[in-house]
Amino acid sequence: MRLLAVTALLLLSFAAPAHASSGCTVYNGACVQKHTNQAWLVTNGVTSYGPVRISHGKPGFGTPVGNFPVLRKVKNDWSVPYNGPMPNAVYFTTDGIAFHQGDLNSQTHGCVRLSWNDSEVFYNNLFPGERVQVLP
């Protein structure tokens, strides 16, 4: 039993922190790094998915930098202000900023766009109350 406990501690000590060089401090949730156009999921302080390519807010509609809670999820949402689909939306600000599927080759009105497959993974693995950290 003692050997099992020691082995488990050794394995945990070698687990890579969630992109430590990025400055992301999320323990459970997601990190976004705008200057590299990447995002990743974090579980128990370790990167569990990604990094993946993203698109984020264009000038005048910047994706806000900071720490936010996941607020809600909507499988097939529609943006009324921008008249467009928001599949796999995971909202993390009260003014409508979310992760969702969309074109990665153009900038957004503040949301974080993901590929179809990545948006499904983020949708299925982020939950209300978990954290999203957006880095410059």
Question: Which residues does each predicted region cover?
Answer:
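Secretory targeting and sorting signals
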Residues: M1-A20
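Exported/periplasmic cell-wall-interacting domains
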Residues: S21-Y27, K58-N67, R72-P136
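A structural motif detector for short, solvent-exposed N-terminal "entry" segments of globular domains
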Residues: S21-K58
